């Protein structure tokens, strides 16, 4: 039997965020016939990733995170360490999803003269640096200046990002959402009162493809 593909997600109390997880599991299952697919939460839920891993003889954890913050560096690695050799983890999916962010941004309507990339933020500088690199690539794709604003744990904040873009002469701003699923963070974005806000990535073909390709790379014998 194929190794179980465990999609590692943050965890949420937001109804739409939970629905996203169910939809993502279904989409990945459809893209990888014959592969058992499960969700493993790293926070908030009663059963966390390290416990989920224990239920399977072999598993591949694919961290569905846009940056390698604490949960990727600590929780995922801890789940692997506690698995007794039954689980491995792949790199997180974030680096492959800039075009998905751009797609959602363009779907939000005509772009203004600049973009605010709204990101959750991390206590890990390396994770925030990944977000800044994403902003640079997004700017190249949409041919607009992109300023980054963090919602939690880091600076510049969303408000500071807007202020800086305004100071640079950009007043018609569109928000790109650096997140996979809806969550409580949306209230912080709405508080900006900007004209257009892009949806989070959601069930995007690039996300599904990134998850499946990482699983296949970790199980080459089964893919052959």
Language model segments and positions:
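Active-site-proximal alpha-helix that buttresses catalytic centers in soluble enzyme cores
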Residues: 1-224
């Amino acid at each position: 039997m194929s190794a179980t593909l465990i999609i590692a997600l943050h965890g949420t109390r937001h109804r739409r965020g939970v629905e996203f997880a169910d939809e993502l599991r279904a989409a990945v299952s459809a893209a990888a016939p014959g592969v058992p697919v499960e969700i493993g939460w790293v926070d908030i839920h009663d059963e966390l990733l390290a416990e989920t891993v224990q239920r399977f003889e072999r598993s591949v954890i694919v961290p569905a995170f846009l940056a390698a913050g604490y949960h990727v560096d600590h929780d995922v690695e801890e789940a692997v360490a506690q698995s007794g050799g039954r689980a491995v983890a792949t790199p997180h999916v974030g680096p492959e999803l800039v075009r998905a962010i751009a797609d959602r941004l363009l779907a939000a309507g005509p772009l203004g003269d600049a973009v605010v990339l709204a990101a959750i933020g991390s206590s890990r500088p390396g994770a925030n640096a990944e977000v800044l690199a994403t902003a640079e690539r997004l700017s190249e794709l949409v041919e607009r200046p992109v300023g980054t604003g963090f919602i939690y744990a880091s600076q510049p904040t969303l408000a500071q990002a807007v202020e800086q873009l305004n100071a640079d002469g950009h007043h018609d701003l569109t928000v790109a959402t650096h997140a996979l699923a809806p969550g409580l963070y949306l209230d912080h974005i709405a508080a900006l009162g900007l004209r257009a806000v892009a949806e989070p990535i959601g069930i995007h073909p690039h996300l599904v493809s990134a998850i499946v390709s990482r699983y296949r790379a970790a199980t080459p014998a089964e893919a052959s």
